[in-house]
Amino acid sequence: MSQEYTEDKEVTLTKLSSGRRLLEALLILIVLFAVWLMAALLSFNPSDPSWSQTAWHEPIHNLGGMPGAWLADTLFFIFGVMAYTIPVIIVGGCWFAWRHQSSDENIDYFAVSLRIIGVLALILTSCGLAAINADDIWYFASGGVIGSLLSTTLQPLLHSSGGTIALLCVWAAGLTLFTGWSWVTIAEKLGGWILNILTFASNRTRRDDTWVDEDEYEDDEEYEDENHGKQHESRRARILRGALARRKRLAEKFINPMGRQTDAALFSGKRMDDDEEITYTARGVAADPDDVLFSGNRATQPEYDEYDPLLNGAPITEPVAVAAAATTATQSWAAPVEPVTQTPPVASVDVPPSQPTVAWQPVPGPQTGEPVIAPAPEGYPQQSQYAQPAVQYNEPLQQPVQPQQPYYAPAAEQPAQQPYYAPAPEQPVAGNAWQAEEQQSTFAPQSTYQTEQTYQQPAAQEPLYQQPQPVEQQPVVEPEPVVEETKPARPPLYYFEEVEEKRAREREQLAAWYQPIPEPVKEPEPIKSSLKAPSVAAVPPVEAAAAVSPLASGVKKATLATGAAATVAAPVFSLANSGGPRPQVKEGIGPQLPRPKRIRVPTRRELASYGIKLPSQRAAEEKAREAQRNQYDSGDQYNDDEIDAMQQDELARQFAQTQQQRYGEQYQHDVPVNAEDADAAAEAELARQFAQTQQQRYSGEQPAGANPFSLDDFEFSPMKALLDDGPHEPLFTPIVEPVQQPQQPVAPQQQYQQPQQPVAPQPQYQQPQQQVAPQPQYQQPQQPVAPQQQYQQPQQPVAPQPQYQQPQQPVAPQPQYQQPQQPVAPQPQDTLLHPLLMRNGDSRPLHKPTTPLPSLDLLTPPPSEVEPVDTFALEQMARLVEARLADFRIKADVVNYSPGPVITRFELNLAPGVKAARISNLSRDLARSLSTVAVRVVEVIPGKPYVGLELPNKKRQTVYLREVLDNAKFRDNPSPLTVVLGKDIAGEPVVADLAKMPHLLVAGTTGSGKSVGVNAMILSMLYKAQPEDVRFIMIDPKMLELSVYEGIPHLLTEVVTDMKDAANALRWCVNEMERRYKLMSALGVRNLAGYNEKIAEADRMMRPIPDPYWKPGDSMDAQHPVLKKEPYIVVLVDEFADLMMTVGKKVEELIARLAQKARAAGIHLVLATQRPSVDVITGLIKANIPTRIAFTVSSKIDSRTILDQAGAESLLGMGDMLYSGPNSTLPVRVHGAFVRDQEVHAVVQDWKARGRPQYVDGITSDSESEGGAGGFDGAEELDPLFDQAVQFVTEKRKASISGVQRQFRIGYNRAARIIEQMEAQGIVSEQGHNGNREVLSPPPFD
């Protein structure tokens, strides 16, 4: 079928006409234009150049370039959000044109006009609805100009709700005009879709999937045809039967599941084993179920059947005999594993009457049951009616797999293996029917199905399938096996029986975890006691046998042959029982032995998942814990007296330690100790300790060849000098050659020496795996008050140490005391130092971190939950701002707002003719009217034609340093001088580079956050640079802010707190700048980065660069020094105003020179002050430091001093700043990052643990070449015009400041400094009472 379809639909390439070529090419271009337009609309950015935006300073962000930006801006301005639908409409029109390009219909101009009217109505109403109900997009109206006009027209007349309804009505009419669809049709379509969805959902919920589907039934029929042979019936009958079955199954899906098939089974008179549903085979040989001899409801066939055993002339026992032959020949349905038994041949069918009868007992294999037979006593006679070949029905073949099966044991075990069938009427017992059914089950193939039959036929049918209630049921003995080889057919059970049985079995599987399976009642009931099925007890077995008694003798031989054949594949073994049901037996291969009730034992994994530990597991854990305790327990090596002595020594040591911590060092000296007694006690103690050590190592046995113990071997002079001091000094342990001894399996006990008895040192014996090198001295962190004692934590508790261990705590060993064995320099005692005092010179070793830079975990993390922005409150504030501006006769509209962590900026669109200066002058009045602390007016917003109004938030958020440092802008910046400032009003981090500033001036009043901002910048560089990259010179006049950084390896010198030393440090920076410029000039580079690259290149070439300016007398170096990498130098001055007030004008020139020239040399200044007045921040300093940061200041004058413009006086404080970056005149408002003192101390301690600072000598010291402490009598400190001024004064013989000022055209201050320098040199005299000076130097030589 598919081949024919392919041949009919073969595609051939046909050429288009010229008109169609042009049309398709044009359509393709239009579609591409629509795609480009959609990309331009989606990537629209307000800062791009467009019709409403003409000035920009950034690259174009729009994907469509400049045309895309212009077109997107125009469409948004006209249509608003409806501009996004324009590309979709264009693509739809192209598709419509391409689909109807071949239609030659005449154009209906009236219809075209109606469609045009509908399109216009849709566009206008859509824009109007968007303008009324949707939020604005960017700075455009949501409906564009069209929507704004409609909304402003309709709202005064109909309000927003009425306008929306009116526009919806017009939109509906426009849709009908444009598409030609009736709304009735649209409603019907919508209703039909909804009903289809509901119908589909309801059918899905009512569908029953508890049994197999129709396809599975069809597969079952095909499978049975393949395995059991072709059914002998006409094709018409099979088609009719299949149609009836499908219709019945379709009807059963929509009826009550609990009552399904009930009426048909009870009142229709049909047999549930009719051919229309079930086929019957016996070991692969087909048998007719409608045989007149074996049916209980009719005696004649409705039609002639050539395979009828009565009409075709074949003997009635042929099907049974054929089945027996098939069983013995192939055993195709046998279990996978069968026991090998000695069975007689099949030929011996005639047996004497003395042979016992057998009960046909089905035995399951690993997956399915295999029916086998076992001998039974004569007490179970078989009725002749059950030996007829009509029992070949394969009902069990079609029933589902069950987890268990009934077993019926015979009364006594007989040695014979041949079956015997007694006459039926001799013993009419109720169990005979059940016994006969067991026999019949051997004729049906049950290899792939469970042999238990859990159904009963109604009373109207022959009780051939009546099964007894098993004595012991096991519904959850093992999981229900999944049959994949043969799909099960429909069982002859009522549907409610199937559902209830399956659900009950699932419930029992879930409930039966640890309880044994209960035994059912011993009554002949159906499997489920809750179900009532017709019983066969009402029909006596004798009457049932009499119905077919004439045929009993003819079938007996066939039955015996079949039973004999079945014994070939079944083990002959049975249990003795007194006529009742036999107990539950074990299933499997071999003899079936009795066993107790079956209980499902959970696995270890299941028990562990429920937290239940098996006894073996608990015992193993107990043994492991006992072994761990015994690892340190060496009680078998010591007697009770020794253990008591060790405990007393430990108690005495702890008491002595407590007293020493309480009273200090004098506690040991207060105890009078005689020298002779002390020596004797020391010798005795050493002897005892040595004996104990030998006992620990060698279990009390003296090794062969060992030298005897002698105190003379351990006497040396250092110990005698330390006898009176005791072990309370933190001394190191000398290195002793260890004695290689085998490791003991159990760690020795700990025994502490009493500190009151100074003793001689003893030799230290260590295990081979222990390190011989002495450990460094550590102080115990739990006891910082008494650091005299030296503690060393044991690393390997198994190996014994020379110290003594405590037997009471084997799991957590106590710190070990080490004996002093050699005199060392006494360590500084800080017993009297309070733990809260700062230890600037603290040399205690710290744990060295493994990371190259400090971890962000040292800083406080920001809160995980951030309070959302209240847009409703912002809208209310925007309306309030408009109202307050209208009170001052300023018409402005709030078009946008940008909420930040501290403030919110409202963008005002002023009316034509309104100046921004008017709002700036009203800043205080607006703050008063809006009930806020301060209002800052931003007259120019870059990239926008609006005026900004910054108002503080009601709830201020804290900006944490960690969240700013953990940012891509900071991480990706390669500069080691990268600093973070905080966040801007939009919440974006602000990161600056000190190398590009290149100097920074910070000003702010007390409490404005200036010191916190400086700390944030220092921590930023500490998180970014190594000490070899950046070095600091910190000047802190207050000795509070920067002194905390004392001891970090980045410092060039100690934190400078004396202002005279500060002037020397600045002077050293000037000299260092000059030296670096000389070196860079010799290497031909322009900045410090290029210089370091040259040095690195020389190192890679393995040819270091020698210092070109070194002379042999310059230093004590024996060899020519080479150039090394130079770090950046950052000079931080915390209180610049105090420095200026203390030193005066002496440092102004130094700062000015550094600000002018130090950038290329890698020296940068950071000056912070509280008072940004003109006498502190002079014009000379401001001119060379373009980068400024202004925190809150007191007045506009101070704001203009620091920023050259107002605005800093209206800041909110607590880190709120204005940052004026390099090459920018517009300041940026930044909310500074908050840094706690604990975070600063944590980072400082982290860097202290990494290494000690390498201070440079001579930075703060005075030298003759430098002219003293801040003096100007050195040649390098004189003014460049000093020599010319001296010549001018000596020639004119008149020394006046005004004369020097006029002659050289310099400032008054500079001229005054030159005259002062002349006075210091002795060229002119001091100023007289009249203000004149005398020239003391002689005139120049002519």
From Swiss-Prot:
Side of membrane Cytoplasmic, spans: 1-24, 99-115, 180-1342
Record's compositionally biased regions (Basic and acidic residues): 619-628
CDD domains: TrwB_TraG_TraD_VirD4
Membrane association type: Multi-pass membrane protein
Native source organism of the sequence: Escherichia coli O157:H7
Residues in compartment: Periplasmic: 45-74, 133-162
GO BP terms in the entry: cell division; chromosome segregation
InterPro entries: FtsK/SpoIIIE/SftA (IPR050206), FtsK_4TM (IPR025199), FtsK_alpha (IPR041027), FtsK_dom (IPR002543), Ftsk_gamma (IPR018541), P-loop_NTPase (IPR027417), WH-like_DNA-bd_sf (IPR036388), WH_DNA-bd_sf (IPR036390)
Quaternary context: Homohexamer. Forms a ring that surrounds DNA.
Entry annotated with the keyword Protease: no
Region of interest called Disordered, as start-end residue ranges on this chain: 345-386, 434-489, 576-862
UniProt name for this protein: DNA translocase FtsK
Function: Essential cell division protein that coordinates cell division and chromosome segregation. The N-terminus is involved in assembly of the cell-division machinery. The C-terminus functions as a DNA motor that moves dsDNA in an ATP-dependent manner towards the dif recombination site, which is located within the replication terminus region. Translocation stops specifically at Xer-dif sites, where FtsK interacts with the Xer recombinase, allowing activation of chromosome unlinking by recombination. FtsK orienting polar sequences (KOPS) guide the direction of DNA translocation.
Subcellular location: Cell inner membrane
